[in-house]
Regions:
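N-terminal cap/lid segment of alpha/beta-hydrolase-fold proteins
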Residues: 60-103
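Hydrolase active-site cap/lid region
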Residues: 197-248
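Alpha/beta-hydrolase active-site loop
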Residues: 156-177
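Conserved alpha/beta-hydrolase "acid-adjacent" motif
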Residues: 274-280
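N-terminal targeting or regulatory segments adjacent to alpha/beta-hydrolase or S9 domains
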Residues: 1-74
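C-terminal catalytic histidine-bearing segment of alpha/beta-hydrolase fold enzymes
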Residues: 282-329
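Short beta-strand/loop motif that positions the catalytic acidic residue
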Residues: 259-262, 266-269, 273
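Conserved alpha/beta-hydrolase
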Residues: 128-150
Length: 329
């Protein structure tokens, strides 16, 4: 009888660990497995992109209407160069669209977010257009595993490797004549992570814009796990399998601690963001204040995830102009 109870107990414990592991793997896989396409925006170009294509996909009616009614034709660009350049990590070739309109003017590298994504998406194209309207050049890029850049993995590295791609874009711009102090960075959602990490490696980059960025690993881990109806107790399992799948340690995903005192940052976020909660914005703000980081902050009112640029394009454009012109030469 005693032996039977022990067997039952051990079986129960084993089953519990098995379920725990399976749940952790499922969440990690679901988060990190990349869709290499651009989804509904596959084959979109700077002169043809549209927010209407996938407006019906947004479950939030406000976000859907915002994109369905956005006057995209006003923001199309007709001239760009299709460019290729190497990542700073050897063996990886990257693709971008170069909008080099203004001689002797600054340029901003624009980095997209998580899949399905790329320079094809409305967000990157809109930011490029707003910058061009303000007399600032732009380079939109596909990070590794996206768009026309090399596919080297089926799993997202969360910016912990792809920051080298941002540095590759930076090297490319220097090679074609742009000076270090005239190159700024703009990261959208998860794209803000490789942007912040890249800037930490190159202190000559003086202007870094982060739109709807995560700030700290334990916060985003808790947020992501909750989407699957699980508690933070599943965090270690998700982190373990995330490391196996992606080849990076997600615990290192702490962009806030990569901010420096000799660079300038602009953080913007939607106050109603449900994808990347605004507490990440609050975390950045508190960290910057406590560590004397030179930063500006704009919490866009009545805005969800990366909605600010679509809801307030003129204000967004003005803020970018002021920030980049103040901090780039």
């Amino acid at each position: 009888m005693k032996r039977k109870l022990i067997i039952i107990l051990l079986s129960t414990v084993f089953l519990g660990f098995f379920i725990y592991g399976v749940a952790g793997f499922y969440v990690a896989y679901s988060i990190l497995k990349i869709d290499h396409t651009c989804g509904w925006h596959e084959n979109s170009k700077p002169n043809s992109w549209s927010t209407k294509i996938d407006a019906h996909e947004y479950s939030n009616l406000s976000r859907s209407r915002l994109r369905d009614s956005f006057p995209v034709n006003e923001y199309h660009l007709e001239e760009w160069q299709n460019v290729y350049f190497p990542s700073r990590e050897k063996g990886i070739q990257l693709n971008g669209w170069l909008f080099n309109y203004y001689p002797d003017r600054p340029i901003v590298i624009i980095v997209h977010g998580i899949y399905p994504n790329g320079k094809c998406k409305p967000e990157s194209n809109l930011i490029a257009s707003l910058l061009i309207k303000e007399g600032i050049n732009a380079l939109t890029i596909d990070l590794r595993n996206y768009g026309q850049s090399d596919i080297v993995s089926d799993y997202e590295d969360l910016g912990l490797k792809s920051y080298n791609d941002v540095l590759g874009a930076y090297d490319f711009l220097k090679k074609i004549g742009f000076k270090s102090n005239s190159i700024g960075l703009h990261g959208i959602s998860l794209g803000a992570v490789p942007v912040i990490f890249a800037a930490n490696k190159e202190k000559d980059i003086k202007a870094i814009w982060a739109d709807s960025s995560l700030a700290e690993f334990s916060m985003v881990l808790e947020d992501e796990i909750a989407r699957y109806g699980l508690s933070i107790e599943f965090g270690p399992a998700v982190s373990f399998f995330g490391k196996i799948l992606s080849g990076v340690d997600p615990v290192e995903l702490n962009p806030a601690v990569k901010l420096t005192n000799d660079q300038n940052y602009f953080f913007t976020h939607g106050d109603k963001d449900q994808r990347m909660l605004s507490r990440h914005f609050d975390y950045f703000k508190k960290y910057a204040e406590e560590n004397n980081i030179k930063s500006d902050f704009w919490l866009a009112e009545n805005s969800y995830h990366v909605d600010g640029m679509f809801k307030y394009p003129d204000l967004y454009s003005e803020k970018m102009k002021n920030f980049f012109e103040d901090n780039l030469k």
